[in-house]
């Protein structure tokens, strides 16, 4: 789960991380009121969407008068902001953040992520803040420094000081940087975050260290422990289909293709999409029904996929381990009838009660295209989507 920058800064503030004074605004008049409360002479008007690259897309403006705050708020609020993370369709801006301007001298980058190889938390930092870290990693990997943090000890003073020095924090400002890094780590740890990022971390001309941005992602599996984080959820920033899927415990992600995929298991789902692309097709979605798929879940999965106007065919690819193939077959048959399925349906099933499941499909009277291998299934669904 993602949250907005102003919400991320609220979290940082709770953990002692220095951030600029600022507030969210949901209208132009509210933005002006916030600016007047903060006082001048400089304000930053920022679009609040769940995507990076807002500055390059025109979603961040520096205002030097109240009139400019009004002008920029009017420009940004309601705009369809396109960044490298939104896709070409962009994201509508429904809220702003207005905060006091900062004396920017040195922009740095710091973040915390989970390293699945070492199964520990990694603190990353770079002297190249204020830009896309992916670009830095590609062109100048030597400028990214990493610290492995032992969960049993947390981020040690020496580790924080060492990273701060490596990314260019002046010696006199290292104690401030240490406090920020340790506060960021505590926020990451105590909220069950999967990402906590400050980009940029600013060092002003008088040596003050302050977080000018805040980005958090949270582990959805841990949200039951954090109702205060769930309260930050902004459904306007999420795909309606994905919101609907979550009600039925379906892992669903919309994609740009025209071939629907219904699979059990995330790994098999990704392999299925790769195989479809290998044979020239484009998946319309990632959909993992999990190991406990019921007739209701399969029916809802079909309904979700059929809401996509570009859908041309569906591939059901099931490995029956915990989930029996006859149960999936029952769900496919009931789901197809319930939604009056009107696109070609290719089904491939392997595993527990495979023969029974295949017989149920064959006896259903539905025009289901069967396949024995993943390659055959992908070829058939690509052909069906193309009308062949």
Curated annotation (Swiss-Prot):
Pathway(s) per entry: Carbohydrate metabolism; tricarboxylic acid cycle; succinate from succinyl-CoA (ligase route): step 1/1
GO molecular function, one term: succinate-CoA ligase (GDP-forming) activity
Obligatory cofactor(s): Mg(2+)
InterPro entries: ATP-grasp, ATP-grasp_succ-CoA_synth-type, ATP_grasp_subdomain_1, Succ-CoA_synthase_bsu_CS, SUCC_ACL_C, Succ_CoA_ligase-like_bsu, Succinyl-CoA_synth-like
Enzyme Commission number(s): 6.2.1.5
Pfam families membership: ATP-grasp_2 (PF08442), Ligase_CoA (PF00549)
ATP-grasp domain boundaries: 9-244
Residues annotated for substrate binding in this entry: 264, 321-323
Family: Belongs to the succinate/malate CoA ligase beta subunit family.
Record function comment: Succinyl-CoA synthetase functions in the citric acid cycle (TCA), coupling the hydrolysis of succinyl-CoA to the synthesis of either ATP or GTP and thus represents the only step of substrate-level phosphorylation in the TCA. The beta subunit provides nucleotide specificity of the enzyme and binds the substrate succinate, while the binding sites for coenzyme A and phosphate are found in the alpha subunit.
HAMAP family: Succ_CoA_beta
Name of the protein in question: Succinate--CoA ligase [ADP-forming] subunit beta
Species name: Burkholderia lata (strain ATCC 17760 / DSM 23089 / LMG 22485 / NCIMB 9086 / R18194 / 383)
Lineage: Bacteria, Pseudomonadati, Pseudomonadota, Betaproteobacteria, Burkholderiales
Gene name, Swiss-Prot/TrEMBL: sucC
């Amino acid at each position: 789960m993602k949250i907005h920058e102003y919400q991320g800064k609220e979290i940082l503030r709770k953990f002692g991380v220095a951030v600029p004074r600022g507030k969210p605004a949901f209208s132009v008049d509210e933005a002006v009121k916030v600016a007047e409360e903060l006082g001048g002479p400089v304000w930053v008007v920022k679009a609040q969407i769940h995507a990076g690259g807002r500055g390059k897309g025109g979603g961040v403006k520096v205002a030097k008068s109240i009139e400019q705050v009004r002008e920029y708020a009017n420009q940004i609020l309601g705009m369809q902001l396109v960044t490298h993370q939104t896709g070409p369709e962009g994201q509508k801006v429904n809220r702003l953040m207005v905060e006091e301007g900062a004396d920017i001298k040195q922009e740095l980058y710091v973040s915390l992520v989970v390293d699945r190889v070492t199964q520990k938390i990694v603190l990353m930092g770079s002297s190249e803040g204020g830009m896309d870290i992916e670009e830095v990693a590609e062109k100048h990997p030597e400028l990214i420094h990493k610290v492995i943090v032992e969960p049993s000890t947390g981020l040690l003073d020496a580790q924080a000081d060492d990273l701060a020095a490596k990314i260019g924090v002046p010696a006199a400002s290292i104690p401030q940087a240490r406090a920020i890094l340790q506060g960021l780590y505590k926020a990451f740890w105590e909220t069950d975050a999967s990402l906590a990022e400050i980009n940029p971390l600013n060092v002003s001309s008088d040596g003050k260290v302050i977080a000018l941005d805040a980005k958090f992602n949270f582990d959805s599996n841990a949200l039951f422990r954090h109702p205060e984080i769930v309260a930050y959820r902004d459904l306007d920033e999420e795909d309606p289909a994905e919101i609907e899927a979550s009600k039925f415990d379906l892992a669903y992600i919309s994609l740009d293709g025209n071939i629907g995929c219904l699979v059990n298991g995330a790994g098999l789902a990704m392999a299925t999409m790769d195989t479809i692309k290998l044979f020239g097709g484009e998946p319309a979605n990632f959909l993992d029904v999990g190991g406990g798929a019921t007739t209701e879940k399969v029916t809802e999965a079909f309904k979700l996929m059929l809401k996509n106007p570009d859908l041309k065919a569906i591939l059901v690819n099931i490995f029956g381990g915990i989930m029996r193939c006859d149960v999936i077959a029952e769900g496919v048959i009931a789901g197809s009838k319930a939604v009056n399925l009107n696109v070609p349906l290719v089904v491939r099933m392997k595993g527990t009660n495979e023969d029974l499941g295949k017989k149920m499909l064959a006896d259903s009277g539905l025009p289901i295209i069967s396949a024995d291998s993943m390659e055959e299934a992908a070829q058939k669904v690509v052909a069906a989507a193309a009308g062949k």
